Swiss-Prot record:
<dbReference type="Pfam" id="PF07327">
    <property type="entry name" value="Neuroparsin"/>
</dbReference>
<dbReference type="InterPro" id="IPR010850">
    <property type="entry name" value="Neuroparsin"/>
</dbReference>
<dbReference type="GO" id="GO:0005179">
    <property type="term" value="F:hormone activity"/>
</dbReference>
<comment type="subunit">
    <text>Homodimer; disulfide-linked.</text>
</comment>
<keyword id="KW-0527">Neuropeptide</keyword>
<protein>
    <recommendedName>
        <fullName>Neuroparsin-A</fullName>
    </recommendedName>
</protein>
<dbReference type="GO" id="GO:0007218">
    <property type="term" value="P:neuropeptide signaling pathway"/>
</dbReference>
<keyword id="KW-1015">Disulfide bond</keyword>
<comment type="function">
    <text>Neurosparins are multifunctional neurohormones: they inhibit the effects of juvenile hormone, stimulate fluid reabsorption of isolated recta and induces an increase in hemolymph lipid and trehalose levels.</text>
</comment>
<feature type="signal peptide">
    <location>
        <begin position="1"/>
        <end position="22"/>
    </location>
</feature>
<keyword id="KW-0372">Hormone</keyword>
<keyword id="KW-0732">Signal</keyword>
<feature type="propeptide">
    <location>
        <begin position="23"/>
        <end position="24"/>
    </location>
</feature>
């Protein structure tokens, strides 16, 4: 009986802690109401779906990208995020940037 009560208490504590962290997360709260409206027709490098499932403008060649919860954004089509920068050529407008720092492990 004591083991079951301890397990239930530990589970509740974990749930409350996770909920509290999610509520404090500035990333999830940065887009509320009118702040979430993005004119996707003005996206220079196309649009992507962010970590939270919202459509946002993609990052372009040489732009900062990645991070926890993709805080700095996702790269557009034709590019990938290397060492925190979009590397490759945008298939939207053919602008290019190539990360020359070697392998991503050398960031």
């Amino acid at each position: 009986m004591k083991a079951t009560a301890a397990l239930v208490a530990a589970t509740l504590l974990l749930a409350v802690t996770l909920f509290h962290r999610a509520e404090r997360n500035p990333i999830s709260r940065s887009c509320e109401g009118a702040n979430c409206v993005v004119d996707l027709t003005r996206c220079e490098y196309g649009d992507v779906t962010d970590f939270f499932g919202r459509k946002v403008c993609a990052k372009g060649p040489g732009d900062k990208c990645g991070g926890p919860y993709e805080l700095h954004g996702k790269c557009g089509v034709g590019m990938d995020c290397r060492c925190g920068l979009c590397s490759g050529c945008s298939l939207h407008n053919l602008q290019c940037f190539f990360f020359e720092g070697g392998l991503p492990s050398s960031c």
